[in-house]
Amino acid sequence: MGIRSAVELLNRSHGLSLSDQYWVKPESSDLEWDTVNFFTNPFDEELGRTLLTARSSSHRFSLNAPDASTGGDLPKRWTIAGDGTRILIKAGRTGQEPVNELIASDLCSRLGIPAVRYNLGEYDNRPVSTCPEMLTDTEELVSAWQILESVKRDNRLSARDQWIRAAQLFGCEGAAVVHATDDWLLVDYLMRNIDRHYNNFDLIRDVETLRVRPAPLFDTGASLWCGELAIDNRDYKAKPFYATYKTPTARRQLRLISDWTRYDLGKLDGWEEQVGHRLSVTGLVPETRITAIATMLSARIREVRSLAESAGDDSNHKTVVMGAETGIGTGMLPWPSPMEQVEMGNLHWQSTTSGPTSF
């Protein structure tokens, strides 16, 4: 691409993206946001096409494209649909990741969880997921990692409660962030997602009104034993709240859900069969593997239902009202056990449709 440094990339692209409302320009430039932003103006798609294919190119690309500033490890590109909607197209490493995103959308729809709606498509003879831009032209996406780095850490709190506290200090209503956190904790366990890190659960802020809300659930591709040999329900190391632990922690992290009464777990009836159908669409997942995944999901559903029943009215959880003296607001947050306080004290935050559509 002929880019020698990050500074050169910034100068050529103006730092424009589809994830925030910020950009740079020379002081003498007469460029205006209204004429250059990617939310309302057309952009070059050649760079994105090349990034999403397996073919190399010596072409000198225009950086008037959001692809130059899009993060993440998987190949992806932006395009503009006929109605003007910005669409993110994302591939995977194994071919299963795009299907997993669709399955996660189905699951969230069943449970009434706000989530990005993914669809399945085909690009360059490979399965891809597609989803619409989640922001308006006055909003920015702020990652949990950025938010946690912006506040002083309170080591009296567990990792989960430090996140809740930081989100509240950033301006998000306490109940909203607690509910959103519960949502992805539940979905991640049911899907066996192994890659929920501090850069893929976020808040959305309106830069004009400064109102803050949780981002809808997204990025659940690393799920359903994708790329793994063994398919079983052994406990495993879970991100993000126990990422530094050496022992399996997924079941422990599931127990951080604060309010099970929000979920109608009866809506999970038949979900494993739907998953099997979705996985069979591309022909990339063997039938024996699909059967094994469906069997494990049935067991996970039973486990989640059992935990929800035993949680009852959450009477075993000690809570504390954190008021102005703590700088946290007045939300009710679970108070960590003494053991958890010790264990988390040295934590260092880490960044760490029914048929295909062709593009």
Identify what each model region corresponds to.
Residues 197:
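Canonical protein kinase catalytic loop motif
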Residues 1-186, 190-192, 203-350, 355-359:
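Phosphate/dinucleotide-binding and metal-coordinating scaffold of catalytic cores
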